């Protein structure tokens, strides 16, 4: 690890070229955040309404139209035969002459102007919405795991470019889907390719930065992703059709490929090239970094050798590329445990949000207010991490976020029926904020403790665990929300367990990225609270007079 670090310092360190490339990597996050957030808008359920169904009325009343049909269809309740409310959800015993209107959701056009068929996603077909959500999240999970391992074998740039090509094609295909099963498969594949692009971009950015700037550039990328989330409703209001919105997302992915497909804007990670022994490819990139930073490849100082000398030494040590299987993680002593703990905390942070959203729903029943609230909470969580994770350390902040998440969940679980509305709202918002912080910090923490040779696979497993947790909400909806209370109990208990596991993690703040499996195993757990420096022990007995007679105070 020391030799690779010397090579990067000889190439100018975190100089002008690397700063510009790391900053330019923020721009694709806007598009990726917009496309990722489109899932919530595409699957938004319309408000329930009822309409008369003439086929359920007696034959003599089927010819009625307008107010007369509505008056005949509305059930009469009680001894006074008062008409029931026509809007809203009616109880099954009074639903005989009425059916819920298939009001258009995000996948159906009210005017029928959309190209191709539309699908009814309410009433008896409401199961299609959570099924699509589960399919899309499953695609993200598989993409993180499979393409994360691909990043370690083929490189960050190769996976990023290939994922953007597939994302553009699949996004355009979704806009032309002719059946719901086709759309389901396309959404699964689309989620996987988006995960690959996001993961490769995250790894390349992190490996460009030096330890003091890793947190700032990672959180900055998250804030740009929030910008894409905030832009999505405006674009949806502009195009007024979900197919056009999907086509617009594919167009923006194509523009990303047009610009970031060039090596000048997205070069291969020199950190990965050096760790896998591809010194010849790393030499070209590092020389370009050195020239852009004003450092000559042959320049050297008294403390360090020149870039050319360091690269020559690396070439002699590793003449052939060396790739590592993700299964090598099982042969480590400490790294597998760190990955397991961070994956567990990511699972809890992603899965527990459903309970907070459920508690938040009665307080803010509209769609746009919770949407913008969650986007604002994600931005607030990133700013909180930016301010605290460097000065306090990764592990204490993750411990605090996990503790707040578990405490808010337990309070809502125990007293939601007895607490006032403003308290439930406050706990829900606090829990969402803390869970967002836990998810973001778990990803950064995992990227810092996994070695470069398997960092893609390790981070992919941690991110995939978070998407697996998020799939718990749609799965419960698919079963009619019958197990929501049990799900809330399970995730609240897991949050308490994660609180204990976080104590076993090492501290990665201000440390260089480990390159090999041996480097990652050297990251050991440090004390959580730093005490005062230990003082010199004073002698139990005062020195004798003969001691003072033979020594002056200065000599003592």
Curated annotation (Swiss-Prot):
Chief location of this protein within or outside the cell: membrane
Extracellular compartment segments: 45-128, 179-182, 240-246, 358-366, 417-420, 470-483
A cellular component term, taken from the record's GO annotations: membrane
One annotated GO molecular function: transmembrane transporter activity
Positions of the UniProt region annotated as Disordered: 524-556
Record keyword Transport present: yes
Descriptive protein name: Putative solute carrier family 22 member 31
Organism: Homo sapiens
């Amino acid at each position: 690890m020391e030799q690779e670090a010397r090579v990067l310092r000889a190439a100018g360190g975190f100089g002008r070229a690397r700063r510009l490339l790391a900053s330019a990597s923020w721009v694709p996050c806007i598009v990726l955040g917009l496309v990722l957030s489109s899932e919530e808008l595409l699957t938004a359920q319309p408000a329930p309404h009822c309409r008369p169904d003439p086929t359920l009325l007696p034959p003599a009343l089927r010819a009625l139209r307008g107010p007369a049909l509505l008056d005949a269809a509305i059930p009469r309740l009680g001894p006074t035969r008062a008409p029931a409310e026509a809007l809203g959800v009616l109880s099954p015993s009074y639903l005989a002459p009425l059916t819920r209107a298939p009001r258009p959701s995000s996948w159906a056009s009210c005017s029928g102007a959309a190209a191709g068929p539309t699908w009814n996603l309410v009433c008896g077909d409401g199961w299609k919405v959570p099924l699509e959500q589960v399919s899309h999240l499953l695609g993200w999970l598989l993409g993180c795991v499979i393409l994360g391992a691909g990043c370690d074998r083929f490189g960050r740039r190769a996976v990023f470019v290939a994922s953007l090509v597939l994302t553009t094609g699949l996004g355009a295909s979704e806009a032309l889907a002719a059946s719901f099963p086709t759309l389901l498969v396309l959404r699964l594949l689309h989620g996987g390719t988006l995960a690959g692009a996001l993961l490769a971009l995250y790894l390349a950015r992190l490996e460009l930065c030096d330890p003091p700037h890793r947190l700032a550039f990672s959180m900055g990328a998250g804030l740009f992703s929030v910008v894409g989330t905030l832009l999505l409703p405006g674009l949806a209001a502009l195009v007024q059709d979900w197919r056009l919105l999907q086509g617009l997302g594919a167009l923006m992915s194509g523009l990303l490929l047009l610009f970031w497909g060039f090596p000048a804007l997205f070069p291969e990670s020199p950190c990965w090239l050096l760790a896998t022994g591809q010194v010849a490819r790393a030499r070209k990139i590092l020389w370009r970094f050195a020239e852009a930073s004003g450092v000559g490849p042959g320049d050297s100082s008294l403390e360090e050798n020149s870039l050319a000398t360091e690269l020559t030494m690396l070439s002699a040590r590793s003449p052939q590329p060396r790739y590592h299987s993700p299964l090598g993680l099982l042969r480590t002593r400490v790294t597998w445990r760190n990955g397991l703990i961070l994956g567990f905390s990511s699972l809890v942070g992603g899965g527990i949000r459903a309970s907070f959203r459920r508690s938040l729903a009665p307080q803010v029943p509209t769609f746009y207010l919770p949407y913008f609230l969650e986007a604002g909470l994600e931005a607030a969580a990133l700013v909180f991490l930016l301010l605290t994770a460097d000065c306090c350390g990764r592990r204490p902040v993750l411990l605090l976020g996990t503790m707040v998440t578990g405490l808010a969940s337990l309070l809502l679980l125990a007293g939601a029926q007895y607490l006032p509305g403003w308290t439930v709202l406050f706990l829900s918002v606090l829990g969402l904020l803390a869970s967002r912080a836990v998810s973001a910090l778990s990803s950064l923490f995992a990227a810092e403790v996994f070695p470069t040779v398997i960092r893609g696979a390790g981070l992919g497993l941690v991110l995939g665990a978070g998407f697996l947790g998020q799939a718990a909400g749609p799965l419960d909806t698919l079963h009619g929300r019958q197990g929501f209370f049990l799900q809330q109990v399970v995730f609240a208990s897991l949050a308490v367990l994660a609180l204990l596991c976080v104590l076993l993690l090492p501290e990665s703040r201000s440390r260089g990225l480990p390159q090999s499996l041996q480097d990652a195993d050297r990251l050991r757990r440090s004390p959580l609270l730093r005490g005062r420096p230990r003082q010199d022990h004073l002698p139990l007995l005062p020195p004798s007079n003969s001691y003072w007679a033979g020594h002056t105070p200065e000599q003592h």
